[in-house]
Amino acid sequence: MASIGIGCGSYFYASRYAEYGLSAVAILGPGTVAFFGSVKIARVLHHRITQGRWTQKENSAWWKNDTNSIRWNSLIPLMVTLVTSYSFTICMTYAWGFASQAGLNQGIISSVMNLLAIFDCIVFYFAFGEKVGWIHIVGVLLMIASIVCIGFAVNASEEDDEVDEDADEEDDEIDTGGRSKALNGILAIAIGLGAPVSLTIQHYFIRKHSGVYTGQAQAFDVAPLLNIVFCFFMPQLMDQLDVTWEDIFVGGAAGSMMESGRVLISYSIAVGLAGPVTAIVNANIAYQTILGVLLASQSLDTFQVSGILLGFLGVCAISLFDNVVKKVKLTRRLSSLRS
């Protein structure tokens, strides 16, 4: 569900506003803040009506019921999640920009996010003793192969279209920003690596503090704060785009879907295996591709079809096959005990 939410939200956001760079995040802000603000108000009112109180202090991440004091430690995961969300957005935006100036396929940068599953597996193994089975490893590898296939295929086709349109134009040369292509390529990869590192740090703190401050609560509290800051980019965006109410609605819907997906990710990270979870979520690019086919009449090439099929097999390996193996092992144990 998290992968579907992020994939659908990313499609509607990227297809309309990605060309405006970092300032495009402003279009996500107003609607997303309104959505999560409304949900928070509705939850408070529901609790007031059903329990007769505005808050539930005994289960609050922000209140110590035994000492009747504020739980200041909850600020740590909140601020870490907020800062790492900003750093992820900034790293990906500038990495794509440098990749374009280096003449690189931007799918390389998108594929760097595959390292997140590997980073999570390593960090969670040493920090929490979390181990993954061979089926999970196979599933993660299939998901990585899926994203690589789709990422390279989509971006390669976009670059081919641009080359065909501009082949006869004199200004077809790449704007390197005054730097060499080699330097731009190094900057693209180096900054792009900051994105999975940022989310690995975020996932570590989500799990570490999940006993008191649940993963979904952290993400739910961060979502409006993150998008309030995005709103400050609106003047910069309005210099490039005549923003309409339709844009606000589409941006809000896209932002709400992506943030809802992140809430589900945070919950899954807190209670499940971090590496396989992030591998499945990274398959959101497959949903973007499918929406492009259904809504924009885009065609699928061999790489994209292969990527979607590999992604499906990866999900099955991580979730379905794992349950089957567990049931088989349980059946064998019961049989041995009976005998």
Task: Please tell me what each predicted stretch does.
Residues 1-26, 37-39, 159-212, 330-339:
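Glycine-/small-residue-enriched transmembrane alpha-helix faces in small-molecule transporters
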Residues 1-3, 50-92, 186-195, 240-260, ...:
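Loop-to-transmembrane-helix transition segments
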Residues 3, 19-48, 76-80, 142, ...:
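Hydrophobic alpha-helical transmembrane segments of multi-pass integral membrane proteins
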Residues 5, 9, 82, 86, ...:
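Hydrophobic/small/kink-forming positions within alpha-helical transmembrane segments
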Residues 7-21, 87-104, 112, 126, ...:
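Juxtamembrane C-cap of transmembrane helices in multi-pass membrane transport proteins
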Residues 26-28, 102-118, 209-225, 259-294:
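Helix-helix packing/entry segments at the starts of transmembrane helices
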Residues 41, 116-138, 286-306:
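C-terminal transmembrane-helix exit sites in multi-pass transporters
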Residues 135-155, 165, 169-177, 303-322:
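Hydrophobic transmembrane alpha-helices of multi-pass small-molecule transport proteins
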